[in-house]
């Protein structure tokens, strides 16, 4: 645990980047506070950008901090399995922290505006974002450990991004993008706008 905290102190800038990624998704949907399902989907949907980023970061950090020669030299120290796991968990924790911050903000907004909760599908909606970030981080770490080349970084970023697009095209609800979950709400908002205009 101390090692994870040490890595978190060394990688504090990642927390800011993950917050920015959440902001980029949040700013596209100004009416999110009207619906609980939509709000939670936005928090989880930021993995469209966050997962490729975290995969690339983990691959980069493995190559920079623990190249294959270093891992081989330290293999007999008894902590070889912690060489990359502590670092990976630190990166994942920053991603989860950013998600938690925006989840709290979204929940407070929904409570204040008496948002509709009929579309909630718990716990599915709350789990997909953290799982997607964690899986992408470990994929980046594993790929960097198996393929000792700097090309691992752009390859992992592109591969994870394309995988997100593929899952989105399969229309798996709430998995990796907010778009599928918000289709019903979008239609309601478009219908309600003329009504408000003539009211």
Where are each of the predicted segments found?
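Membrane-interfacial helical/loop segments at transmembrane boundaries in membrane proteins
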Residues: 174-188
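Hydrophobic alpha-helical elements at and bordering transmembrane segments
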Residues: 4, 83-84, 143
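Transmembrane helix segments
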Residues: 151-178
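Helix-loop-helix units of permease transmembrane domains in multi-pass membrane transporters
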Residues: 57-94
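Secretory targeting signals
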Residues: 21-53, 58, 88-157
């Amino acid at each position: 645990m101390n090692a994870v905290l040490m890595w978190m102190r060394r990688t504090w800038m990642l927390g800011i980047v993950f917050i920015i990624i959440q902001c980029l998704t949040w700013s596209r949907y100004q009416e999110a506070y009207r619906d609980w399902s939509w709000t939670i989907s936005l928090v989880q949907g930021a993995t469209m950008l966050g997962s490729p980023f975290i995969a690339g970061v983990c691959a980069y950090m493995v190559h920079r901090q623990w190249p294959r020669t270093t891992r081989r030299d330290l293999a007999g120290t008894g902590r070889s399995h912690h060489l990359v796991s502590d670092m990976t968990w630190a990166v994942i924790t920053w991603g989860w922290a950013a998600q938690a911050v925006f989840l709290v903000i979204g929940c407070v907004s929904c409570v204040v505006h008496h948002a509709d909760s009929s579309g909630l599908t718990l716990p599915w909606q709350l789990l997909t974002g953290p799982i997607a970030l964690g899986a992408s981080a470990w994929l980046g770490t594993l790929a960097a450990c198996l393929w000792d080349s700097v090309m691992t970084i752009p390859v992992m970023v592109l591969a994870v991004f394309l995988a997100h697009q593929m899952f989105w095209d399969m229309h798996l609800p709430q998995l990796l993008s907010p778009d599928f979950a918000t289709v019903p709400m979008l239609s309601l908002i478009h219908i309600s706008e003329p009504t408000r205009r003539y009211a």
